[in-house]
């Protein structure tokens, strides 16, 4: 029998050994679970220490987990809500912290869901053991802590900034370096989101790998923790050994900038277009019509070497040129008939006339924008004088289309639209005058630009002083006038009189979305503004500074887009970090010239139209057949809806009256209203994408081709009626041609003359090539029958 004291000692010894072993096991387990381990990332990068803000939240964003359709939505998903696009690290850490297990990282609810080990509506976001998984696991195992402010980026750099491929079918690696507020610099390439703008030119692989596909240029937008950079991609055309770039005429700095880019891409521009091609294009682009057969013959026969420049000057001074641009600017500035007071269509006409008159006398863009952006109703007039002028205006508007509104110094209708709030007018102003889309910042930080919700609200507050109603000075006169109007017969009653005025002392304010404190008015990327005076005027002065990065560049880009079918920045109202210009040297040269010339619109137009670049043929050569953005040739493009109507009528030789929508003898391009009464005109406008002018961005209208447009031109009864009753009927009526055509006895020479006249009217050139083309492309030719 064992001695009891010895037994007790033995038991105690064994117990202590087991306890020690257990303690060691726990310690080893803890060490295994918490000791930082190097993580191998794509591209051979070693991550020594995982940071919540820099790495974990970057993976969350890269996987799309904090997007608007997932956990970043306002209500979240499955009870789990993150800040949209990761704008709030503190909120995100609190939400994620509830779904991790620091004692057993692999058993964390977050990882089980993301790897689909547990049911997940968002599917599998990454696999167990992947580098993304290891980033999460390592951070959880370390305790799931957050170092506040560690992810504040002060600079994001793409290396290289321009990727120059040797040709299609090769690869290159982008590297992204982030500099943080604490001074550290890190290769964050695996944590970035990459998006290629044109995947025809290049496609993306994993982790910033880019493969060239076809000749051209594009950009890759790189996003990391809400910061955006873009890298330019150039893929030159393959050329034969010994290729020598040809010489051709350089007319002005436009041609030099375009030539410089084309040489980098081994792209040769098309030849200069023929006289017929030039005349038709310039007439459509400047006055929204086509030349008559007589004009074509006279221009082709003219031997003056300056005839193109003379024709350009002639057309730029044509009243229809101002009307065309007044229609374009009506779309840009939001001349929406439905948002105006009665008589709505006439007020749209006033808006259009105000723009047209200034364009006719070639007022500078700065002057035009000043009249819009800083507009008030009374100006310097006394209330009684203004009330009298308003009554005269209302009476003239009811009687016809002509009023004296265009003589007013400012366009107060821009601010007098109904149901347009502070946010909407700020979005419209940013897009129209700065070329910047701020709409998405109403709810969250812009995913591909630098703008935040605070930037958005600070800019909106610039316009918070503008009121519509009755100012203290004019209140008595306005109330008396409205009482008088109320007593008028119903069918003669004018709308309630309201003035647009500035109320410096009691502005509307949007608060900071985080602190709920008032935000001072501020220009986008510019200074805070003094609230003691009209902040709109201060904004305008900032816009007109020569070094302003938006105002001049945005408008010359719109001019370029009008004449080429696409902007140097495209879309034209999307100047952003993630959407760089295709040719920044060209854009900067145009903008600098525009500012130096006092914002002279016609000067820029004249330069563009006289350039070889604009006058190139639409026929491609073997080097530029794939070009879509470097202006190596003229790009075929659709016309504005009103121009389609006018061109069709001019080509067919018919006059269409729009008596319900425009004065007698006016064209569709002079119809100001968006609510059109003429049924045929309304139908054509709808089919050809006429802008409703209800949206702040240029996406509201469309000039893209569609099946409905093709069917309209082929089968619409109104089109067929104009064909039968227009120029063709007139030509066939000469000498009984119609009867002899029906009898099959018409002479060949007579029929050729008819074809020639119709082709000159429609295409601006001799028809023979087109007749042969039509024959060999017919079913009768291509099929055996």
PLM regions and their residue ranges:
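Positively charged n-region of N-terminal signal peptides that target proteins for export
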Residues: 2, 13-19
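Bacterial N-terminal signal peptides
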Residues: 21-31
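Sec/Tat signal peptide C-region and signal peptidase I cleavage site
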Residues: 32-36
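Solvent-exposed helix-loop boundary motif
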Residues: 37-133, 150-177, 185-250, 281, ...
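Catalytic cores of secreted or luminal carbohydrate-active enzymes
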Residues: 112, 126-146, 708-725
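Primarily short, surface-exposed interaction patches in extracytoplasmic proteins
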Residues: 246-320, 325, 331-660, 699-700, ...
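Long, His/Glu/Asp-enriched segments that create or flank divalent metal/ion-associated functional microenvironments
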Residues: 651-674, 678-714
């Amino acid at each position: 029998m064992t001695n009891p004291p010895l037994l007790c000692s033995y038991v105690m010894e064994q117990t202590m050994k087991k306890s020690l072993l257990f303690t060691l096991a726990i310690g080893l387990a803890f060490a295994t679970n918490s000791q930082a381990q190097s993580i191998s990332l794509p591209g051979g990068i070693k991550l020594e220490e995982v940071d919540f803000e820099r790495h974990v939240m970057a993976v969350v964003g890269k996987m799309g987990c904090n997007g608007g359709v997932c956990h970043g939505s306002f209500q979240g998903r499955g009870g789990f809500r993150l800040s949209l696009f990761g704008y709030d690290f503190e909120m995100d850490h609190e939400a994620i912290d509830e779904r991790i297990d620091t004692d057993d990282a692999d058993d964390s609810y977050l990882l089980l869901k993301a790897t689909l080990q547990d049911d997940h509506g968002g599917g599998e976001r990454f696999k167990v053991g992947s580098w993304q998984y290891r980033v999460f696991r390592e951070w959880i195992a370390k305790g799931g802590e957050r170092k506040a402010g560690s992810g504040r980026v002060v600079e994001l750099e793409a290396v290289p900034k321009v990727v120059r491929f040797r040709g299609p079918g090769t690869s290159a690696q982008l590297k992204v370096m982030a500099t943080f507020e604490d001074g550290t610099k890190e290769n964050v390439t695996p944590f970035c989101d990459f998006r290629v703008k044109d995947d025809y030119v290049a496609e993306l692989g994993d982790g910033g790998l880019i493969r060239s596909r076809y000749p051209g240029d594009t950009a890759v937008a790189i996003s990391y923790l809400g910061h955006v950079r873009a890298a330019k991609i150039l893929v030159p055309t393959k050329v034969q050994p010994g290729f020598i770039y040809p010489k051709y005429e350089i007319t002005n700095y436009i041609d030099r900038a375009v030539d410089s880019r084309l040489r980098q891409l081994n792209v040769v521009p098309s030849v200069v277009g023929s006289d017929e091609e030039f005349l038709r294009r310039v007439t459509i682009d400047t006055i929204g019509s086509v030349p008559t057969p007589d004009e074509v013959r006279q221009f082709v026969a003219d031997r003056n070497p300056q005839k193109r420049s003379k024709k350009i000057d002639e057309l730029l001074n044509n009243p229809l040129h101002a009307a065309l641009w007044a229609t374009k600017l009506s779309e840009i500035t939001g001349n929406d008939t439905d948002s105006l007071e009665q008589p709505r269509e006439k007020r749209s006409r006033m808006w259009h006339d105000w723009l047209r008159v200034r364009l006719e006398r070639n007022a500078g863009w700065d002057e035009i924008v000043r009249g819009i952006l800083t507009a008030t109703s009374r100006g310097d007039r006394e209330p009684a004088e203004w009330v009298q002028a308003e009554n005269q205006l209302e009476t003239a508007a009811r009687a016809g289309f002509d009023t004296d509104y265009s003589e007013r110094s400012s366009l107060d209708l821009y601010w007098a639209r109904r149901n347009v709030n502070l946010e909407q007018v700020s979005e419209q102003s940013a897009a129209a005058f700065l070329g910047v889309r701020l709409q998405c910042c109403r709810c969250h930080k812009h995913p591909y630009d630098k703008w935040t919700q605070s930037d958005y609200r600070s800019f909106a507050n610039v316009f918070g002083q503008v009121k519509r109603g009755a100012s203290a000075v004019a209140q008595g006169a306005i109330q008396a006038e409205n009482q008088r109007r109320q007593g008028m017969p119903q069918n003669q009653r004018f709308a309630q009189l309201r003035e647009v005025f500035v109320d410096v002392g009691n502005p509307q304010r949007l608060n900071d979305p985080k602190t709920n404190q008032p935000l001072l008015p501020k220009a986008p990327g510019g200074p805070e503004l003094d609230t003691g005076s009209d902040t709109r005027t201060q904004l305008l002065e900032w816009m007109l500074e020569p070094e302003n990065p938006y105002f001049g560049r945005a408008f010359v880009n719109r001019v370029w887009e009008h004449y080429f079918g696409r902007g140097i920045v495209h879309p034209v109202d999307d100047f952003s970090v993630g959407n760089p210009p295709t040719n920044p040297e060209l854009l900067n040269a145009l903008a600098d010239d525009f500012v130096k010339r006092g914002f002279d619109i016609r000067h820029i137009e004249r330069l563009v139209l006289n350039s070889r670049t604009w006058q190139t043929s639409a026929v491609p050569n073997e080097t530029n057949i794939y070009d879509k953005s470097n202006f190596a040739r003229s790009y075929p493009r659709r016309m504005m809806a009103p121009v389609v109507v006018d061109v069709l009528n001019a080509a067919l030789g018919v006059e269409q009256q729009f008596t319900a929508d425009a004065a007698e003898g006016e064209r569709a391009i002079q119809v100001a209203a968006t609510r059109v009464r003429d049924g045929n005109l309304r139908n054509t406008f709808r089919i050809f994408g006429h802008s409703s002018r209800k949206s702040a961005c240029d996406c509201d209208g469309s000039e893209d081709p569609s099946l409905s447009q093709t069917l309209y031109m082929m089968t619409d009864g109104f089109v067929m009626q104009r064909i039968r009753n227009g120029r063709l009927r007139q030509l066939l009526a000469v000498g009984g041609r119609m009867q002899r055509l029906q009898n099959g006895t018409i002479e060949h020479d007579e029929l050729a003359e008819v074809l020639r006249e119709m082709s000159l009217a429609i295409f601006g050139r001799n028809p023979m090539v087109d007749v042969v083309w039509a024959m060999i492309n017919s079913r009768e030719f291509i099929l055996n029958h």
